[in-house]
Amino acid sequence: MVYNSRSHRNKGQSMEHVDGVEIDVVQPSTKDDLARALSALHADGIDLLIINGGDGTVRDVLTMGQAVFGNEWPVLSVLPRGKTNALNVDLGGPPDWSLSDVVAAYEEGNCVKRRALMVTAKDRDEPAMLGFIIGAGAFTLGIEAGQDAHRIGFFDSLAVGATAAWGIAQVLFGSNSNQWRSGTEMNLAYEPSGEPMPHSRHGQPSRRHIMLASTLQRMPMGIQLFGKGQAPIRLAVLDRPRRRIFAALPAVLAGWHPGWLSKAGLHHLSAEAFSMKLDAPFILDGEHFPAGSYQIDQGPELTFVSA
């Protein structure tokens, strides 16, 4: 088990144990320590790798584990102990899932297959990152606002709700120079064809208000931003924050995706892979990464324990 003692719900808590089950626990403090710990676990032989933390911990374990496991990963499971735990929602795990629950589900063979997003910088020589939710534009601002919500004590669904309310207010009542309305320089293209993703006549062709992409099938709070037919990489792209779109937003998030949305500037897209060029930072599973050019592919097929 990779145990992140800094995760929100692990602070001040004692580590769980399961009678009759041998669990090797590592608590790396840096990413280099994490890579060494994963290598040691792999050398010893491992059947189940438990990730005790939030979405950011999962991202780091998957990213640093690429060089260790390649395409032959052990079965994975998540104990949701972070400020955000979107992957656990998709896997069907309850927020209070315990170590004994995970072990029981693993022994019963309750598993699902998932592929993470593989994000590779085109302009820097560094390993690809693996994560499940990537966003840019106003999504980055939303995550920053969410960190403010965390600092005043809002977490999970409450933090999402508070952040969404603040962002919508900025869009509806802010001026065009407001950073929540001005958008981000963002070139998006399908790969490997290089075909540009569609852009409506609203806003500047080189700018987008928000981009969100994921391989998850279920989102937190029951949000149905993506359509059922979208796969394998599901994208939602908003060209410009028009009031007509935001008036329909509650219905859109509940799964109503009428045909006029694309002409109005909200696109629901599917891709095998895509590229993005940004002039502002983006977010991968809760963490900022620098502006630049990136290739987004599907990572290796992973097996996760499910509830």
Please give the residue ranges for each predicted region.
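Short, conserved beta-strand edge motifs with alternating hydrophobic and charged residues
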Residues: 187-189, 210-214, 236-238
